[in-house]
């Protein structure tokens, strides 16, 4: 694909609005081709390394299925399956894997790790998730939004993110809004807003592209007229229980529930979540939250909303694979 060959995919702001749009168009085409049985393998003979310092369901499955569909082979290097950062430096690992593989995916910790891999590997490196950014997720989100509002451009869409916006999802949403011209509203307590420097940079770019970025603590004002309401988990399994109580107290008023959906005034509003979601007590963590904090029926989103007709979270999950496939095809095939 012209302009993408041998490029890295580390964060969205590394690309132009036109480049982002072309990736989304390619993803839509690859999805249609797969469903019609007309998919053409562009990556036959390619070898891909998947480095996972953090476990994953959607990201791993998306990369593996996308690679297999396109004729490539993969090697999975899990949290205990390589010497990266332990007995071998990131720099040396990059140079070793770059001699053996045609592309490298990294999912793990600091953004500096994936940047170092990209600097020294000599082959395309893709960011499957870092502490700072989650660009492949946003590609899937944008494709899903296009599919559910086919008559609208991004300039005509309003996306609300409710909850903890200071994480990799909040950062990548800012970058997506900057490039697409979305009306993005981060509805969160001020303590959970992203870093001011990134907000300023992305807001300026968004305005150039016909969009707007708003940060507010006011739920009613923030969600008014929204086309999509998005949230993510509040706590992680590895965090101390003291953090759980603090986070839940801070974010309880930002739970996505039927009241919030109604406050949009839009009967067609859709619900988005990058998953996994704690919408019931059917998981270990969900059960603990219900028992210890009275969060029966959901934490960041209620089970009622998650299971409603407004929920398009499984369309999102499927689109992880199609958009990741687009990234690999664009960067590995001429």
Curated annotation (Swiss-Prot):
EC number(s) reported in the record:
2.1.3.3
Which InterPro entries does this chain map to?
Asp/Orn_carbamoyltranf_P-bd, Asp/Orn_carbamoylTrfase, Asp/Orn_carbamoylTrfase_sf, Asp_carbamoyltransf_Asp/Orn-bd, Orn/put_carbamltrans, OTCase_ArgI
**Parts of the chain that traverse the membrane:** none
Binding locations of L-ornithine: 168, 232, 236-237
Quote the function comment for this protein: Reversibly catalyzes the transfer of the carbamoyl group from carbamoyl phosphate (CP) to the N(epsilon) atom of ornithine (ORN) to produce L-citrulline.
Name the source's superkingdom: Bacteria
Q: Which family does it belong to?
A: Belongs to the aspartate/ornithine carbamoyltransferase superfamily. OTCase family.
Question: Where is this protein localized, as stated in its record?
Answer: Cytoplasm
Query: Which cysteine pairs make disulfide bonds?
Result: none
Q: What is its main location?
A: cytoplasm
Q: Which GO terms describe its biological process?
A: arginine biosynthetic process via ornithine; citrulline biosynthetic process; L-arginine biosynthetic process
Task: Tell me what reaction this enzyme catalyses.
Answer: carbamoyl phosphate + L-ornithine = L-citrulline + phosphate + H(+)
Which pathway is recorded for this entry? Answer: Amino-acid biosynthesis; L-arginine biosynthesis; L-arginine from L-ornithine and carbamoyl phosphate: step 1/3
Q: Which residues bind carbamoyl phosphate?
A: 56-59, 83, 107, 134-137, 274-275, 320
Q: Which UniProt keywords apply?
A: Amino-acid biosynthesis, Arginine biosynthesis, Cytoplasm, Transferase
Please give one Gene Ontology molecular function term for this protein: ornithine carbamoyltransferase activity
Quote the cellular component terms of the Gene Ontology held in the record.
cytoplasm
Q: What is this protein called?
A: Ornithine carbamoyltransferase
